[in-house]
Structures are given as structure tokens and as C-alpha cells.
Amino acid sequence: REAAGPPPGPPPPGYPTHLQSSGFSVGDAISWSWNRFTQNAVTLVVPVLAYAVALAAVIGATAGLVVALSDRATTAYTNTSGVSSESVDITMTPAAGIVMFLGYIALFALVLYMHAGILTGCLDIADGKPVTIATFFRPRNLGLVLVTGLLIVAVTFIGGLLCVIPGLIFGFVAQFAVAFAVDRSTSPIDSVKASIETVGSNIGGSVLSWLAQLTAVLVGELLCFVGMLIGIPVAALIHVYTYRKLSGGQVVEAVRPAPPVGWPPGPQLA
């Protein structure tokens, strides 16, 4: 009789087993995310502020160059009352069109870099690893993230041409694709497939999580720019918590206050 060998080990990262019941609760996701945010507030807020400044710089520079390179024609008008006015017509030149195209590419790349960087930091927080501000500027698997993002945008655009709804549906079910690429180093196609399977395993939880993330961002918008510095990190943490729980992963639970040190007091004698 042959001796039984050791049991097979778990699949390597990027090849999750069949998704089982996650026990996901959107209330737990919000509570965990807020707890983690309060413990890492400065570390989370500073990168979001820096990325916002970078995005504004790219948008402003692109708009300024497009206007500067475009042809402008000024027409003066005088009405019957003798009041003069002017109108300026701006015609985009080929050079301005090229600058606008390059600006869109730069903006898209920066958004994906920001998304991957914030996810990298939030995933480290979920693993209980120490994070610094620099962690959020060192995204993992950036090449996979860029290709995955291009794939999602392309399919969503094609779906949008088909009465809009197919594109919206694909965008929703592919919401965890970038997280898979960052966390498990899966290929772009495998990342999208894994996201579709993850969302399909718990559509209700995915919808509630998405609504919670949207609410966090909208509340941040209502509180002006300062609120967005809180809303975006909280939404990212909710996203990571949901991704981990629904895909069969784990997160380090929120730290609870330690019990008082020492023996409890005994009964008092009269």
C-alpha cells in the first residue's frame, strides 16, 4: 500500500478557487473603512491631495495649450442704439487637436496610475502592513493595470454604442478588475473574468458597496474640496474591503480598544 502524500496546497495567487459565501455586510465594510481611515488619515489624505493637484495641472496645461494653438477671430458688432460688442470665435488647428489628444492620453494614464497607487496602499492596509505616504505612489503591476484599464474602457465604449446599457453593465461587473491586477498579478483578461465572477457571486453586496462608495464621494462633494479628501479614501477602502471579502480573501479586522489591565476588583467586604 502506498503512503498517502501530503494534501494539495492552495492555488497560487491569481487563481482563486470556487467562490463561497463571503458573509459580506456593507455595514461592516463602512465601519472597517472608517476605522482604518481614522488610523491612517494623514497617510491617505496627502496622496489624494497630491493626485488632485497633478490632475488639475494636466487639465489646465492641456486647456491652455489648446486655446493658445487655436485660431481666434474677433468680430465687432454695433446695434441700432450704438452699443458695440465683440464675439470671439475659436477654431481648433491641427496642432491644437494633437495637443488635446495627447492631453487625454496623459490624463487617462494619470488616472490609472492614481487608481493603482491608491489601491496598492489600501490593499496594504487591508493586509495590516505599515503604510506611508510614499506607498500610494508606488503602484504594483502598473503595466497590467494600464492594459486592464484600456480593455475596460474599450469594451465599455463599445457597449455604450449599443444603447448605453450594455456598457454600464460591463463597467459594473468589471469594477474589481484593476484590484485583481494589482493584488494578484492576473492578466487583463483574467482580471476581468475574475471580477465578473466575483460580482456575479454576490450582486446584492456589490450593488450596496457601490452605492456606499458613491455616497462617500457625493457627501465629500457636498462638503466642497476638503470633503473629497475624506470621501475618496473612504470609498477606496470600502472598495478594497468588498473586493477581498467577495473574492474569498481576508482583511485585518479593525482594532478594538484593549481591555483594562489588571485583575477586576473583587467583592467588597462590609
Regions from the language model: what does each represent?
Residues 27-54, 130-159, 173-221:
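Interfacial aromatic "cap" segments that immediately flank transmembrane helices
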Residues 11-124, 149:
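Short, small/hydrophobic-residue-rich motifs at membrane-helix boundaries and re-entrant hairpins
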Residues 61-66, 73, 174, 206, ...:
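Short alpha-helix boundary/capping motifs
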Residues 47, 54-58, 66, 70, ...:
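Short, surface-exposed, charged/polar-biased interaction segments
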Residues 78-94, 180-208, 237-264:
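Alpha-helical transmembrane segments and their immediate juxtamembrane interface regions
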Residues 9-17, 93-129, 153-190, 217, ...:
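Selective recognition of hydrophobic, aromatic-rich stretches within alpha-helical transmembrane segments
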Residues 2-3, 84-90, 101-104, 143-144, ...:
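Short, functional N-terminal and low-complexity linear motifs
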Residues 1-22, 252-270:
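Intrinsically disordered, low-complexity Pro/Gly-rich regions
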